[in-house]
């Protein structure tokens, strides 16, 4: 049967026009804890069983699952539902919390990424709507709780990727300070894997004050724009993409001051946007992250390799390496 290219184009246009519903539907399933329910059950579940366990009525649940099965998230056999390798990545221990954060009004608001917002430069959602800073508005407590849970989940996954794919990064290190380390999830996982390392979780005093104790991790409060605790290495995991180039250079200079001039290094764990068409499996996701930054953060962005090199040169680093860790992030190691 001949392929009607015009029909294909129209179908593709409809897919783009409606594509936002893909993540919306998946977020609804995560909110209903369907991936965790199926995982805990350990086998096939009927619609009635899944409805009872999730608290969602049969008819809307059926339609939701029909959509997600069509898109390859879950599987179905003999009118019963089951996990797939993909849906397992959306349990509470994986990307589930990140999906919930992306579903909050702050993240999803069309005010963030609109033509008008881009023209006026008010891409930060709360600034464009209320003239307030997203980090300090108490009315957005729900978003911030979801954000915190998402960052914990992300830290676990990224630390695991480093342990699996670049353990040599910690060879010879006695101490590592995680700048913006919040409650120490990432550095805690890394210290577990590399017990000869003393970890330091460094964040604002009000954040580290609530941190639970972690073996091998010290918590230090402070301001990364003023000084960074001294260590053999400094790690910046998903920190610099929040800031403008000028602010990133300030942060990097403070990190450079905190490490030994002859043996220290700064480890930047962040996305690198690919612009040469070669890329990898995560190239599209990295571009999507940049659209989120464009919508939510006034100054932040994901950067290309050339843009990262510019920051490192301006901050006074003499050399650097880049390591692919089979993740949405890479590890950039910068040396004084």
From Swiss-Prot:
Top enzyme category: transferase
Disulfide-linked positions: none
SUPFAM superfamilies in UniProt: S-adenosyl-L-methionine-dependent methyltransferases, Winged helix' DNA-binding domain
GO biological process, one term: methylation
Annotated control of activity: Substrate inhibition by genkwanin (GENK) at concentrations above 2.5 mM.
Species this protein is from: Ocimum basilicum
Effect the entry attributes to changing residue 111 to T: Increased ability to produce scutellarein-4'-methyl ether (SCU4'Me) from scutellarein (SCU)
Active-site residues, as the UniProt record annotates them: 241 (proton acceptor)
EC number(s) per entry: 2.1.1.-
Pathway annotation from the record: Flavonoid metabolism
Tissues expressed in: Expressed in leaves.
The protein's name: Flavonoid 4'-O-methyltransferase 3
Family annotation (Pfam families): Dimerisation, Methyltransf_2
Summary of the function given for this chain in its UniProt record: Flavonoid 4'-O-methyltransferase involved in the biosynthesis of polymethoxylated flavonoids natural products such as nevadensin and salvigenin, aroma compounds which contribute to the flavor of sweet basil, and exhibit pharmacological activities such as anti-allergic, anti-oxidant, antibacterial, anti-proliferative, and anti-inflammatory effects.
Keywords: Methyltransferase, S-adenosyl-L-methionine, Transferase
Biotechnology usage: Nevadensin is a selective inhibitor of human carboxylesterase 1 (hCE-1), a key enzyme responsible for the hydrolysis of a wide range of endogenous and xenobiotic esters.
Binding site for S-adenosyl-L-methionine: 140, 203
PANTHER family from the UniProt entry: O-METHYLTRANSFERASE
Lineage: superkingdom: Eukaryota
Catalytic activity: scutellarein 7-methyl ether + S-adenosyl-L-methionine = ladanein + S-adenosyl-L-homocysteine + H(+); cirsimaritin + S-adenosyl-L-methionine = salvigenin + S-adenosyl-L-homocysteine + H(+); cirsiliol + S-adenosyl-L-methionine = eupatorin + S-adenosyl-L-homocysteine + H(+); genkwanin + S-adenosyl-L-methionine = apigenin 4',7-dimethyl ether + S-adenosyl-L-homocysteine
């Amino acid at each position: 049967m001949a392929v009607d290219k015009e029909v294909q184009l129209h179908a593709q246009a409809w897919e783009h026009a409606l594509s936002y519903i893909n993540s919306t539907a998946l977020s609804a399933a995560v909110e209903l804890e369907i991936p965790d329910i199926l995982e805990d059950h350990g086998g096939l579940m009927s619609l009635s069983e899944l409805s009872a366990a999730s608290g969602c009525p049969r008819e809307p649940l059926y339609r939701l699952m029909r959509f997600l099965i069509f898109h390859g998230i879950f599987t179905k056999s003999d009118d019963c539902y089951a996990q797939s390798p993909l849906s397992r990545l959306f349990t509470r221990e994986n990307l589930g919390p990140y999906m919930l954060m992306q579903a909050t009004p702050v993240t999803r608001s069309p005010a963030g990424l609109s033509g008008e917002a881009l023209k006026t430069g008010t891409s930060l959602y709360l600034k464009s709507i209320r003239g307030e800073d997203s980090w300090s508005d108490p009315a957005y407590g729900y978003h911030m709780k979801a954000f915190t849970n998402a960052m914990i989940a992300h830290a676990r996954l990224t630390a695991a990727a480093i342990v699996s794919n670049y353990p040599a990064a910690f060879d010879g290190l006695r101490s590592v300070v995680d700048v913006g380390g919040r409650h120490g999830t990432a550095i805690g996982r890394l210290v577990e894997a590399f017990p000869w390392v003393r970890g330091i979780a460094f964040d604002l005093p009000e954040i580290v004050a609530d941190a639970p104790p972690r073996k091998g991790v010290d918590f230090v409060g402070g301001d990364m724009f003023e000084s960074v605790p001294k260590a053999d290495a400094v790690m910046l995991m998903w920190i610099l993409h929040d800031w403008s180039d000028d602010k990133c250079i300030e942060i990097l200079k403070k990190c450079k001051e905190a490490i030994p001039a002859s043996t220290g290094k700064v480890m930047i764990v962040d996305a690198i946007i690919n612009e040469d068409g070669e890329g990898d499996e995560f190239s599209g996701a990295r571009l999507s992250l940049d659209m989120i930054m464009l919508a939510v953060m006034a100054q932040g962005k994901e950067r290309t390799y050339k843009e990262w090199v510019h920051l490192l040169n301006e901050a006074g680093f003499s050399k650097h390496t880049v390591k692919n860790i089979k993740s949405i992030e890479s590890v950039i190691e910068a040396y004084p």
